[in-house]
Amino acid sequence: RQMCIRDRGYAACENAEKGNYRDGNFGAGTGATVGKLYGPEFCMKSGIGSYAVQIGELQVGAIVAVNALGDIYDWKNGKKVAGLLEKDKKSFLCTEDEVYKSYEVVKNKFVANTTIGAVITNAAFHKTQLCKIASMTHNGYARSIRPVHTTADGDSIYALSTGTLEADLDMVGTLAAQVMSEAILRAVMSAELSLIHI
């Protein structure tokens, strides 16, 4: 008997609770790619990534599905780790440089892109503060994805609070951006068959 969509959704939730989560091209990361300016032939595999830190009692974590038009950089050293490939598929092109080659409107831009993430903390914040944390977390996207927030991307971040710990909003927002940068890096580094070493 074939499972209906509702049954599949329920089964997916049950499996998620069993500790089956993996970074890389699994779950929401299945089918994710990066560096898609010239279409699927020259892009690289990506996936879903996560990372969390604890400072004292404060916990901040991020999870992100990285399916971006742009290239991915290691936020710690600025080195490109995934993205638009040259025709020989042995080296990278720079998506930003390729975009700068012409200011004319590109009608057939590869538009099936979105990087969607969430940042979660055990600190207590209300809705307006969580919106600010989500906004600050976009700095993690900017450190790691270039270009980011284009009209061909649907980039978004959601912030959630699960606790009652009192913490400084600016500290948590700044830390959230760093945690998100690492989650993005882990998404591409964990994807199977994704990386070339240059």
Cite the ranges covered by each PLM segment.
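Glycine-rich, charged/polar anion/phosphate-binding loops
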Residues: 44-55, 59, 97-107, 142-145
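Phosphate/diphosphate-binding glycine-rich loops and adjacent basic-rich segments that engage nucleotide
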Residues: 8-75
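Hydrophobic alpha-helical bundle architecture
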Residues: 103-111, 117-152, 165-174
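Glycine- and Gly-Pro-enriched alpha-helical subdomains that act as flexible
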Residues: 63-113, 117-125, 166
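Stable alpha-helical structural segments in soluble proteins, enriched in small hydrophobic residues
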Residues: 8-20, 133, 144, 176-183, ...
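Flexible, glycine/charged-enriched surface loops at secondary-structure junctions
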Residues: 20-26, 106, 143-156, 191-195
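Internal helix-turn-beta structural module
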Residues: 149-150, 155-195
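Short, small-residue-biased leader/transition segments that mark boundaries at the very start
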Residues: 1-5, 198
